[in-house]
Amino acid sequence: MNDRQELERVKEAVRRIKAETNLETCCSLGLMELDHLKELREAGLDRCHHNLETAASHFEKIVTTHTYEDEVNAVQNAQKAGLDVCVGGIFGMGESFNQRVELAFSIRDLGTQSLPINFLKPIEGTGTGHLETIEYYDALKTIALLRLVLPKIDLFVCGGREEVLTDKQERLFSAGANGILGGNYLTTKGQDPKRDMSMIEDLGLRPPTSWEVNSNS
């Protein structure tokens, strides 16, 4: 996202959020120029989200529009602009478990503050539509792997959790995650946020308040 008009809209949205709430701001904007990221930082942006998608050794089988190095540079540009970063990937795209380990260490080496875990939901007609959905215990092992490699960051489970973990989603927390993304996702629907809150309350957990989030930044 490097269109000037679109950039100005995002900057204005960030300014309003910072002025009217006590929320932290995070944007997911794709491949960005360093100067534009600096403008967003000056507007009040706290964090930039950018996924590596998959391991470097598997990347060319999944992405053809740009390189793995472009993904890494996007994260590093955000850091150069003074932003925290949120870096994750999508699991279940035909990669081996060793390639998940590879991705985990690549994310660790970038120094991310948080990591979103997405599980592929194969969609007919797409390049990965022929793949099988990642198995339940394989998903839990992947969460545990990421927690082992990255013991101190925020690790949250996002797209695909409803399909992969079904009615046992609460186990993602015992596997090592400490958060979830609620609502709908980029191309798929999520479950009712009220159901998420009920699950969290049943586990005796409590989401942090915005004051607690900001005080720990």
Q: Residue spans of the language-model regions?
A:
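Short, catalytically relevant binding-site loops at active-site mouths
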Residues: F91-E95, K121-E124
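Core AdoMet radical
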Residues: M1-A74, D84-V87, Q113-N118
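Hydrophobic positions in alpha-helices of CheY-like receiver
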Residues: A13-I17, A78, L146, L150
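Catalytic cores of alpha/beta
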Residues: M32-A43, G92-R108, E162-A175
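Generic structural signal for well-ordered alpha-helices
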Residues: V10-R15, L37, V72-V75, A104, ...
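Auxiliary Fe-S-binding modules of radical SAM enzymes
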Residues: T21, F105-S217
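Alpha-helix N-cap and loop-to-helix initiation/capping positions
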Residues: Q5-R9, V63-D70, E95-E102, H130-D138
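Short Asp/Glu-rich motifs
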Residues: R4-E6, H36-L37, F59-E60, S96-Q99, ...
